[in-house]
Every structure is written in structure tokens, then in C-alpha cells.
Amino acid sequence: MRIRYIPADPAGNLTALTLTQVGPEERAAVAAQMMARCPEGFEQVGFIGEDAAKAVLPRLDMMGGEFCGNAARAFACWVDRQRGGGESSLNISISGACQPVAVELDAAHGKAYAQMPIPIGLEEIRVMGRTVPVVHMEGIDHALMPDCAPSQELAQAVWKAMPAQDAQGVMFIQNTTMTPLVYVAATGTRVWESSCGSGTVALAWYLARKLADGEHGFAFDEPGGRLEARVTMRMGRAARIVMGGSVLLGEEREIEL
């Protein structure tokens, strides 16, 4: 099977945007092969909907049906490129999100900012004697591990204690540095990601939830680069969250699987 794809680099979170139409039942297997065999070393794979660049609401489906903010940003940049450039913003549809995602494009600086789904809940779990906050989001949950060095062993224990979800992230946080480890159920993959958009949002939302009304800005240094988040609080609740940073797009490539 010959697969056409676009390599994308949203803040180091290497992503394959697959142009070849692949049925939902085959996506997990195709994605696993691409992550194992493509020379770019992809951390995740998204599948572009048919005639997406011409659609009123372009569609991207992630490999396990999960939500991904970085892939959303990269996909919006690709749609803009296919349309000839010049868009300042556009709406896209992506798996794991119940509503369209608005993306602001800053082509002059090579950046894109996605208006992210607001987390839907917070719970605490107990893991190895410590209390761990888990932020529930559409299509993915994130466990936040403050003052904790990255640890595969600890992540495994956290995953066992988390409720089932399409994707589960464990965010290891040291000051303003965040290291994401993400599990996707459909593909069975566990990846130390270079950056994680939804994890960035989860942490920013968690930090902002008790702050005064108004807009609060956060920036986290992740292995592949810096991601920014802006949380607008109104009447004690998060009303709007925007996440973004750099995006680089490559040219179309092919691989035989």
C-alpha cells in the first residue's frame, strides 16, 4: 500500500498528515507502520479527509480517534497552504472534539494558535503514595505530575489508575519545563512526545482555575520547543483557551507499506 503524506513539525511534535484515503478500520495499523518505518520518526499520524482543502469544514482524524491540538494547528496550516495562503484564521473539524476548532494563523512568524476545547473535569487519583490530578478533556485525559522527573515506571502506574480513554497523557513537570508521555489505546503506542498541545492546555487550565477573571498567559518549555497557552477566566471559570507555537510543514512524500 502506497501512502502519500505531509511531514509536519508543530513545536517538535513530529506528525504525519496522511493524504491517502485510509478506512477507519485500517488507520491504527497504518499509523503504527508509518511511525515505525517513516524516516522522519513520527510521534503521531493524522488522516486528512477527502477533498479537505476544498471543504467548508476540513476534517482530520487522528490515528486512534483521539484529539490533538498540535495536529490541529499543523492541519490548518496545510489547508491554508493548499488554498494559496493568506488566511488569518479558519475552522477545522478534528477527531475527539465535539465542536469545530478555530485556528489563528501567523504565517509571517511561522506560528498557529488553536482555540482549544475547555477541559470538562478534574479528579484526583492516588499513585504510589502521591495524589495526582487528572484533567479530563474531549478525546484525551492528562495526569499532571508536578516536581517529578520523567519516569516510564511511574507513568505505567499512573495509567493503571486512570479511567479508560481514547488517549492518556502523563505530564512530568519541573518548574516551567514539561515532558509529555502519551498512550493511544487504538494503536497501543506509548510515545515520549516532543511537545503536547492538549497537555499544555491541561496544565494551563489547572494553574489558572483559581486565578482572577481576565486573560492569563503561560509558556512551557517542552523537549521539542516552547508552547504557549492563554486562558481567559470569567466568573471563576475558564471561558476560552488558546494554545499555540511554531509550525513547520514539509513537502509531500510517499512510503510503501
Task: Report each predicted region and the residues it spans.
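A glycine-rich beta-to-alpha transition motif near the start of alpha/beta enzyme domains, typified by
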Residues: 1-111, 119-121, 131-136, 141-257
